[in-house]
Amino acid sequence: MNQRAFQNSSTTATRELLYLRQAINVDVAIVGAGIVGLAHAYLAARAGHRVAVFERNPVPMGASLRNFGMIWPIGQSAGQLHRFALRSRTLWLEVLRQSKTRYRETGSIHAAYSEQEAAVAFEFSSKAPALGYDCEWLSPEQALACSHALVSEGLAGALWSPTEFTVDPRQLLSELPGFLSEQFGVTFYFNSPVQRVEPQKLKTPEFRCEAEHIVVAGGDDFQTLFPEHFRRSGVSRCKLQMMRTISQPEGWLLGPSLAFGLTFLHYPAFEICDSRAALKAHLEQTMPEFFRYGIHVLVSQSGNGQLTVGDSHEYGLDVSPFDDSAINDLILEYARARLKVPRLQIAEQWHGVYAWHSDHPWLFFTPCEGVRVLTVTRGNGMTMSFGLAEQTLLEMGVSL
């Protein structure tokens, strides 16, 4: 054998040996370390399964990072969606307590500042408890006693619910992988984009993995894995603009997370209200620019005291990478008229993008044996993640 042939043979053998060293064998492999992927990892690992998670970025960078951190059962449609949200809430609290990740059981207030908004809030408080919601109507005086962050002028009442709570997405996504690794032996492979998935196999540039069950939870990445399935589904994207204030004074707490009249038109839970039609007609006439950009305003507080304020909703596969300052101005104008906080100066602005489908709250594909693709398509992945993960794993035959 000449020297060149020997070198080529040696190089090939080294590569093959390296490839073998980088082979992974687990029970459950998960593509994506956003909250939906992490929920699958927690439930599978808690049940004693060997779990590996592959994330294309150094840290999760998608919708799970760029949101309010609200777990929001009050907004989910009555029936299956609301039941999933409540089950997800139970599992959320379990993992947060185990991991000692900071959260606040704040509840939520939908504050009404017009006769039409108050009518929807009151009607929902009358009908929803029979459908499994825990909520009640508050008079203006009761609402102000419950939240010192509301402007009193013009307040007509509010809808109170104790089921909502908040986490800081940045802290959560930073800490939860470490907890899963240390407590349950979950192995994380960051900077590891998955290039191909087959029955019981997946491949990255550096690793090959064999797993009895594979879950793909890639958010709005419709191009990398099984693009033909996404194409046929009619899935699209939603872009939302959000902001964070500077930190509030030490010790100042927002209390309940806040929503307002526009939110009654955004969340499907409120479709049970006959009075919603009159509110929609009123707001379309008086606030057309808010409808143009799909704006409704929510406010939550992070662990370091900052307030997260947003958001807008623009739809399409080709959502613009450029933000519109006029949208943020509208959000802040609306918030200032209803929100009484020490500091509303903005420290950060960004946009998030999530998968969207007008007909389905989530998409499930089984492109090949042992593989399940899951994408939440209504912007409620934080709320639904653990409930959906539990259902998905059970349907795949993973014992929990």
Regions found by a protein language model. Name each.
Residues F68-C146:
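Dinucleotide-binding Rossmann-like beta1-alpha1 core, especially the glycine-rich loop
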Residues A158-Q200, A211-H213:
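Helical element adjacent to the flavin cofactor pocket in flavoenzyme catalytic cores
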Residues M1-V26, R46:
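Extreme N-terminal leader/targeting segments of oxidoreductases
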